[in-house]
Amino acid sequence: MRHGDISSSNDCVGVAVVNYKMPRLHTKAEVLDNARKIGEMLVGMKKGLPGMDLVIFPEYSTHGIMYDTKEMYDTASAIPGEETAIFADACRRANVWGVFSLTGERHEAHPDKAPYNTLILMNNQGEIVQKYRKIMPWVPIEGWYPGDCTYVSDGPKGMKMSLIICDDGNYPEIWRDCAMRGAELIIRCQGYMYPAKEQQILVSKAMAFMNNTYVAVANAAGFDGVYSYFGHSAIIGFDGRTLGECGEEEMGINYAELSMGLIRDARRNGQSQNHLFKLMHRGYTGVIHSGDGDKGVAACPFDFYKQWINDPEGAREQVESFTRSTIGTAECPIEGLPNEAARS
């Protein structure tokens, strides 16, 4: 893991993250014009960072947030489509991989159902290698249709990569699912705003450590007329230590070289902090000393996860028993969301 140079090597993937200024757009033409700006930024960055293998742009960087529902549906993208064609041209010209946000992607039943909040991982030939739909839209505000699975794909130089989006990162299950699929770099694109700066910086570092994985965070910056975005795009080592981090500046860039050999060695030879291995070999020292085998315990000890798999409605009722039974809350109502007062 190296930070401070502009190079890379056969062992190291050069990764850049961008504090892209949150745009405020209204039409398809404006979205396409902004996509071209992203493409030109990518090409320009490669001139300054010759080792850059992968550049990551934040959630909402292409479309901005469409606060008007009609605009949100009217500007929703097909994938592949006009926006991805622009990105593909830029990736080919720069010989660089990219992660790009499409908010939204048209639902299969468009316009009868809400769009998805989608990320794509595109290779240096302009081909879409991974398309990820946000599993945990930021309710109650975001109106995206939720996705239903994570993915792992071979990225530049063969590094295993997963995409997650913003509020996804507040759920440890998503990180663990990516890591247990073999992800070596989990890419979190976000459009996170104040007041959650401290928590979001903390959670990405903690999840890198807990999942023995590199993490790259690309976050928006600036003010879009509604929210103020705190930036702090960052690249984090698999030991949870920050390699490089932007401040709050608009269009800030940070860059680091991520060694594949180091993370693979750590996962193979690490012991006390090898969380992925230890989770599936629980208590192996005591089990071995007790004569009960040489692998530890593999069985899941967590009742909640067992119930969630086998009885999702029952698991939901259990959570509602100590939270609330309606989507909304009468003490801070949001239009369109049922709450206890409305129900009564």
Curated annotation (Swiss-Prot):
Q: Which residues form the CN hydrolase domain?
A: 13-260
Keywords, in A-Z order: Hydrolase
Give the enzyme's EC designation: 3.5.1.4
What reaction does this enzyme carry out catalytically?
a monocarboxylic acid amide + H2O = a monocarboxylate + NH4(+)
* GO MF annotation list: amidase activity
Q: Highest taxon of the source?
A: Bacteria
List the active-site residues: 59 (proton acceptor), 134 (proton donor), 166 (nucleophile)
The protein's enzyme class: hydrolase
Keyword Ribosomal protein in the entry? The reply is no
User: What's this protein's function?
Assistant: Catalyzes the hydrolysis of short-chain aliphatic amides to their corresponding organic acids with release of ammonia. Also exhibits in vitro acyl transferase activity, transferring the acyl moiety of short-chain amides to hydroxylamine to form hydroxamates.
Which HAMAP family has this protein been placed in? Aliphatic_amidase
Q: Which family does it belong to?
A: Belongs to the carbon-nitrogen hydrolase superfamily. Aliphatic amidase family.
Protein name (database record): Aliphatic amidase
Protein's organism: Variovorax paradoxus (strain S110)
In the UniProt record, what gene is named as encoding this protein?
A: amiE
